[in-house]
Amino acid sequence: MLKQESNDIGSGENNRARPCDTCRSNACTVYCHADSAYLCMSCDAQVHSANRVASRHKRVRVCESCERAPAAFLCEADDASLCTACDSEVHSANPLARRHQRVPILPISGNSFSSMTTTHHQSEKTMTDPEKRLVVDQEEGEEGDKDAKEVASWLFPNSDKNNNNQNNGLLFSDEYLNLVDYNSSMDYKFTGEYSQHQQNCSVPQTSYGGDRVVPLKLEESRGHQCHNQQNFQFNIKYGSSGTHYNDNGSINHNAYISSMETGVVPESTACVTTASHPRTPKGTVEQQPDPASQMITVTQLSPMDREARVLRYREKRKTRKFEKTIRYASRKAYAEIRPRVNGRFAKREIEAEEQGFNTMLMYNTGYGIVPSF
């Protein structure tokens, strides 16, 4: 829209403000990024109110120190808008100036920059107010509102002030408090999980304050209780007299636990024979030997035993006798008396016919014939 023209300013004119690029009569007060032009108030209102596209141009005011460059930072201590060169020059003069808090200046869009000057000052003050956030004028439109919020989300730091409007200098206070709350919640969570684990393992909780009674459960068997006692041995040092409860509600006052003698609360009197218990190292659990593993270790032979067995087997094989053994003598005797036909066992009918034939022969001949089987 506008074309920036070069301004040849001599060394003697460096102290004067830069003139407007349009009228060249008034000092410039606004810099338009879209047109790359320095404009005065009247020219800015005339140019950027022509149409809606021109009203969306982003403009910033000119540096209040040199009045020859667009302002980039707002110094809260000096309440001045400075360009990059003037900001580095002013705030590097002494250590006190380095502590001034500066915030970037956002471009402003609208029909007239002069009508938005008050809004711009209010928005800059709101940026540094801890109880408010960045205020975006509704006249900027949806696009300007979105851009301003996006830039403010990563450009503007969070500044904290106390009631006397003084900077407390602790920018990490909120993060530190959040960290403390997180640690306390994690400690509470760990304590809750630990107490629940103790309840599940039948280990009574201790309050570490004075004498207390320790309820014990006797529903489990002796072996299971001993196993649980070996698995859960915590390094808890305490000294007090324990009072034991059984299932019937009776109290057993005979058990006394000392902080120098034991480091774990016993679960029942069935596994506790004396008041002192040897403390086992952490992470060690005594397991009962497996019978199957014992049998496997017994059946495993050494090479010498195996060689001796092989030799005995070979000697026994040399003297082996291949004889026919009779397993059932009664069956053998019955088989011998059964009739046979051509070497095979005959049926009862054939046997009866042969017996009748033999009887007839004996009657005819007058003497008996001994049959041969």
UniProtKB/Swiss-Prot annotation:
Example of a GO cellular component annotation carried by this entry: nucleus
Pfam family, one: CCT
ZnF bounds (B box-type): 15-57, 58-108
UniProt-listed CDD domains: Bbox1_BBX-like
Chief location category: nucleus
Region Disordered, annotated ranges: 109-130
Subcellular location: Nucleus
Cystines in this chain: none
Induction: Expressed with a circadian rhythm showing a broad peak between 12 hours and dawn. Higher expression under long days.
Family matches, as SMART domains: BBOX (SM00336)
UniProt xrefs under InterPro entries: CCT_domain, CONSTANS-like, CONSTANS-like_Bbox1, Znf_B-box
Binding site for Zn(2+) 1: 20, 23, 43, 48
Gene Ontology terms describing biological process: cell differentiation; far-red light signaling pathway; flower development; regulation of flower development; response to far red light
Polar residues composition bias: residue spans: 109-120
GO molecular-function term, one example from the UniProt record: DNA-binding transcription factor activity
Keywords: Developmental protein, Differentiation, DNA-binding, Flowering, Metal-binding, Nucleus, Repeat, Transcription, Transcription regulation, Zinc, Zinc-finger
Tissue spec: Expressed in leaves, shoots and shoot apical meristem. Detected in the vascular tissue of the hypocotyl, the cotyledons and the leaves. Restricted to the protoxylem and phloem in young inflorescence stems and to the phloem only in older inflorescences. Also detected in the vascular tissue of the root.
Domain notes: The CCT domain is essential for the interaction with SPA1.
Sequence similarity: Belongs to the CONSTANS family.
Subunit structure: Interacts with ADO3, SPA1, SPA2, SPA3 and SPA4. Interacts with MRG1 and MRG2 (via MRG domain). Interacts (via B-box) with MIP1A. Interacts with AS1 to form a functional complex regulating FT expression. Interacts with NFYC9. Component of a red light-dependent nuclear complex made of PHL, PHYB and CO. Interacts directly with PHL in the presence of PHYB.
Additional facts recorded: The GIGANTEA-CONSTANS-FLOWER LOCUS T (GI-CO-FT) pathway to control photoperiodic flowering under LD is conserved between Arabidopsis and rice, but the regulation of the downstream gene by the upstream regulatory gene is reversed in the two species. In Arabidopsis, GI acts as an activator of CO, which in turn activates the floral activator FT under LD conditions. In rice, GI activates HD1/CO in a similar manner to that in Arabidopsis. However, under LD conditions, HD1 suppresses HD3A/FT expression, causing the suppression of flowering.
Function: Transcription factor that acts in the long day flowering pathway and may mediate between the circadian clock and the control of flowering. Plays a role in the regulation of flowering time by acting on 'SUPPRESSOR OF OVEREXPRESSION OF CO1', 'TERMINAL FLOWER 1' and 'FLOWERING LOCUS T'. Also regulates P5CS2 and ACS10 (involved in proline and ethylene biosynthesis, respectively). Regulates the expression of NAKR1 by binding to the 5'-TGTG(N2-3)ATG-3' motif.
Protein name (record): Zinc finger protein CONSTANS
